[in-house]
A protein has these predicted regions:
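Short helix-initiation/N-cap motifs at beta->coil->alpha
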Residues: 2-13, 108-111, 123-138
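Short secondary-structure boundary segments
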Residues: 1-2, 87-100, 134-144
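Contiguous mixed-secondary-structure segments that line small-molecule binding/active-site clefts
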Residues: 13, 26-119, 156-159, 170-212
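Alpha-to-beta junction loops
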Residues: 15-25, 103, 122-123, 137-147
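Histidine- and/or cysteine-centered catalytic micro-motif in compact active-site loops
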Residues: 109, 129-130, 147-150, 181-183
Length: 212
């Protein structure tokens, strides 16, 4: 059975309580359970979708299983959900220096993003994937970052208004990952799942590019 959630943290809580065998969540949420796979979305790590394809293809191979299968948790599938872009309420903001003093909706569990925001002297506004869009749209923050699909899904055009814009620079490559308790499936099944997920890469990326 598949159970949809609107709050990723609630879904993770149910998974950790073993109310389900597998959770599909953003790598930002799953990285604490598999740090190796979590590095895919590190800021600036992968500059284009070609590199994402290469990395995910490599991780889908049998030899990579030792990096994805942990004693307690395993990643049994990864697919792209798009590069993260900056959405700003001021399209004139086109330099790093211009970010100083700006309020940025920042996921409170993404340490590299918090570091980046502090580094450019912006203000961290703790957020999560359920409320960052609302904060941007109501003016509580000046900037948020997300894959392109958020423009429609979170109605970010409200926050952009007439003066805003989307900075055409891929900050990071975000993915959805399937996380399971290692003892829920044998090694053969876990690997088969990874192979199936990678076989859907092109289909997933086509959806991403349509939104972009």
């Amino acid at each position: 059975d598949v159970k949809p959630y609107t709050d990723e943290s609630v879904a993770m809580g149910d998974f950790l309580s073993k109310k389900c065998h597998v959770i599909a969540a953003t790598d930002l949420r799953t990285r604490q359970y598999n740090k190796f796979a979590g590095t895919i979305s590190a800021l600036g790590a992968l500059p284009s979708y070609d590199e994402v394809h290469t990395v995910l293809k490599t991780l889908s191979r049998n030899k990579a299983a030792k990096y994805l299968d942990g004693d307690k948790f395993s990643i049994i599938g990864i697919f792209p959900i798009g590069a993260g872009y900056l959405f700003t309420n001021d399209r004139k903001m086109n330099t790093v220096e211009a970010l100083a003093g700006k309020r940025i909706a920042t996921l409170n569990y993404q340490k590299d993003a918090i570091h980046m925001v502090n580094y450019v002297n912006s203000t961290v506004v703790p957020s999560d994937i359920t409320n960052f869009g609302g904060k941007f749209n109501n003016g509580s923050v000046d900037i948020c970052y997300s894959p392109a699909f958020a423009f429609s899904a979170y109605e970010l055009y409200h926050g952009l208004g007439e003066n805003g814009g989307i900075i055409r620079y891929q900050l990071a490559q975000l993915t959805m990952q399937l996380l399971t308790n290692t003892d829920s499936f044998d090694a053969k099944t876990r690997q088969a799942s990874r192979n199936i997920m990678f076989s859907m890469f092109d289909k997933a990326l086509n959806i991403v590019k349509k939104h972009e």
